[in-house]
Regions:
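Residues on the lipid-exposed face of transmembrane beta-strands in outer-membrane beta-barrel proteins
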Residues: 49-55, 84-89, 137-141, 194-198, ...
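Detector for outer-membrane/organellar transmembrane beta-barrel domains
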Residues: 247-327
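Transmembrane beta-barrel strands of outer-membrane/channel proteins
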Residues: 25-31, 64-68, 98-100, 150-154, ...
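Repeated loop/turn-to-beta-strand initiation elements of outer-membrane beta-barrel proteins
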Residues: 58-63, 93-96, 145-148, 202-205, ...
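Residues that define the transmembrane beta-barrel architecture of outer-membrane proteins
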Residues: 39-47, 78-83, 131-135, 142, ...
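Outer membrane beta-barrel
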Residues: 54-167, 201, 358
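Outer-membrane beta-barrel translocator domains and adjoining extracellular loop/strand segments
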Residues: 33-42, 73-81, 109-115, 161-167, ...
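Outer-membrane beta-barrel "beta-signal"
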Residues: 273, 355, 372-386
Length: 386
């Protein structure tokens, strides 16, 4: 990283007046309908600031984007992270990225089985969408047979967990300062990954491989029942498959993995479709129908998701996403509503609501939403783009 900082400093001094300065400020307020299981407050607010510097030349791109977050209740949710800090060299059939970045793998809407490059910021939300920046070197080769991305990943990032004052957290305290690693190199181990992708008419396909420290730790006792749990990071290898097949207005999606290193080798998959009705009722509004199922060899339950997506296609980019998740084994139901709309040219307002319902049927099966049973909430988020 010191070498990268020197290169970037020289690059900045040589091109300081050609840079584009961007950024965003986000004000978030979450109102929980009930007092938390550990008597946490009902109202949680946060402020985040993400300045951004971007510069593009003929064969180079520089990108810098830190993120700062301050939470009103939970100190463990405070964040100072480099999301992007890299140089990208663009050649005729080759690209080389050196620095810190975020890489997304996946095609499904709800659970991204194959997305393993970056660590999840679990304090941002339980959906696993928000990630931390990952130091890396990435080489991309573009050939007639497809695109091959090869990664060397340095300086492992531990998963972020909410503290005792936080909401949407697990029902026990986790001490990440005492984390244990299977690898003798601990968080200094270099991980490796590769991903091949291509498209054939209506089919997009990707096959990936990862070898390194798992991004999903097991939580183990620390020796006493009244003490926090400790994250245990095992060394794994994982093969992944992504499929996206388009038939007119129908998109069929599959993500599947096979992983070894966390007990017996297991497989898991998310699969489903999204069908879009274009211009419903002779309007500009598109209505998408979403169905996704899940499978995991380790679990008896296979949650199913049914949702809709309304795209108004107006100049303010209004969208509404809603969905139900049903666990047929534990008999639990969850409901999610998300909507967003631009306010003028500089701002965005987003609303989100989450509700968890349990039938109280005692069938001795693990409860998917048990940790969040008192965490039904409504969130309003205001974003100002600099």
């Amino acid at each position: 990283m010191k070498f990268l900082s020197t290169i970037v400093a020289l690059f900045l001094l040589n091109n300081i007046f050609a840079y584009e300065f961007l950024g965003e400020v986000i004000l978030e307020n979450r109102y929980f309908l009930n007092e938390g299981t550990s008597y946490q407050d009902k109202i949680h607010s946060s402020f985040s600031y993400s300045p951004e510097i971007f510069h593009e030349e003929e064969d180079y791109i520089f990108h810098l984007k830190p993120k700062i977050r301050k939470d009103s209740q939970d100190p463990k949710r405070n964040l100072l992270d480099l999301q992007e800090f890299y140089l990208l060299h663009i050649g005729e059939e080759r690209e080389i990225k050196f620095g810190i970045s975020k890489e997304f793998w996946g095609v499904t809407e709800t659970t991204h089985r194959v997305d393993i490059i970056n660590q999840t910021d679990f304090t941002e939300g339980f959906d696993g969408e928000e990630k931390l920046g990952q130091p890396m070197v990435k080489v991309s080769l573009e050939k007639e047979w497809g695109v091959l991305d090869i990664y060397a990943l340095f300086s492992f990032r531990e998963r972020q967990f909410s503290g005792q004052e936080g909401r949407l957290r697990l029902p026990f305290i986790i001490d990440k300062n005492e984390s244990i690693y299977e690898s003798s190199a601990k968080n200094k181990r270099t991980d490796f990954a590769a991903r091949w992708s291509n498209y054939y008419d209506q089919l997009d396909i990707a096959i990936s491989y990862f070898s390194g420290t798992t991004r999903e730790p097991r939580l183990i006792p620390s020796g006493s029942i009244d003490k926090p749990l400790i994250p245990y990071y095992e060394t794994i290898d994982q093969f992944g498959l992504e499929l996206l097949y388009l038939i007119g207005s129908l998109a069929i999606k599959v993500e599947a993995i096979s992983r070894a290193g966390q007990g017996d080798r297991f497989s898991a998959a998310t699969y489903g479709f999204e069908y879009t009705q274009v211009g419903i009722f002779d309007s500009r509004i598109d209505l998408g129908w979403i169905f996704e199922g899940n499978h995991d060899d380790r679990l008896k339950s296979s949650p199913t998701v049914l949702g809709t997506r309304l795209s108004f296609n107006d100049e303010l980019d209004t969208q509404i996403l809603s969905g139900f998740i049903w666990n047929d084994v534990s008999k639990e139901l969850g409901f999610l509503l998300e909507s967003s709309r631009r306010v003028g040219e500089c701002c965005l307002i987003a609303l989100e609501g989450v509700y968890f319902e349990d039938t109280d049927e005692d069938n001795n099966e693990p409860k998917l939403f048990d940790a969040f049973r008192e965490d039904d909430f409504f969130k309003i988020e205001f974003t100002y783009y600099l």
